Curated annotation (Swiss-Prot):
The keyword Cell inner membrane does not apply. The keyword Iron does not apply. This is Fructose-1,6-bisphosphatase class 1. Mg(2+) 2 binds at D112, D115, E283.
Amino acid sequence: MSRVTLSRYLIEQTRSNNTPADLRFLIEVVARACKAISHQVSKGALGGVLGSAGSENVQGEVQKKLDVLSNEILLEANEWGGHLAGMASEEMDNAYQIPGKYPKGAYLLVFDPLDGSSNIDVNVSVGTIFSVLRCPDACFSQNDALGEEAFLQPGTKQVAAGYAIYGPQTMLVLTLGHGVMGFTLDRELGSFVLTHENLCVPQSTAEFAINMSNQRHWEAPVQRYVGELLAGKEGPLGKNYNMRWIASMVADVHRILTRGGIFMYPRDAREPDKAGKLRLMYEANPMSMIIEQAGGAATTGTQRILEIQPQSLHQRVPVFLGSKEEVERVTGYHQG
């Protein structure tokens, strides 16, 4: 039986689920950009792209050279195709305007070009996260600049979401709202090939991912829940749990997606003015769509992430996502 490439899968989705052709083309362009980023990441020190770029992004985080390069790759790949009304990135303060010499399209692309880049110098898996929204008709113009308000849509409005993970293999994990598919990059063919069909998160688990060094700064419901996990078989949950933490959201969530578990990044008492660490629009929303499409759950502890009405492009939220049973338990502790 012939292998199913990403292009073939997307064409079949156009036939069976009425996926618009321009969305199909957009996903293919994003995938090509991810292949280019994968190539740069794999060069490591040989490519001269490791280390700091000597600048900070809008969050005040030091930008790595590969952050900047990955951002440029995604912008240049997507700006000219006529599928997008605008783009937004973790690495840019404001929305990216499609140059006037190119036509505009119906969609908005929001992305974290290189998630986990603080790990790049030590050769740990990193990735690209992206979200696709429709541009509201009221915000669309071929001639005028696109405002931030066009992007401020709840995650339920996403028409596609995905991530690429650059590890021992390069994988693209994608949802168009009809389940979650995993594609592995065949470097000989130069194509992403369908290798993981209809990914599902196990409902019950014995793994969790959280940065335990921050434990003293967590809110009481998180302290309670993690305490119960650590209590093991003798504790109230009646089983032993393993903790894993890579400090790369793509890598941590990919493990949760394939093996089950719960990923947690709660709010932190050291920064009471910030609701959390992870960004809603281009980290929490796309990952939540993927996890929910795979049968899991994703909340802030008090609210379903996909139902949050964004207030700003770089808004932060606490995140609890993964196996439904565990997410519902910790969410219940917050609400009780």
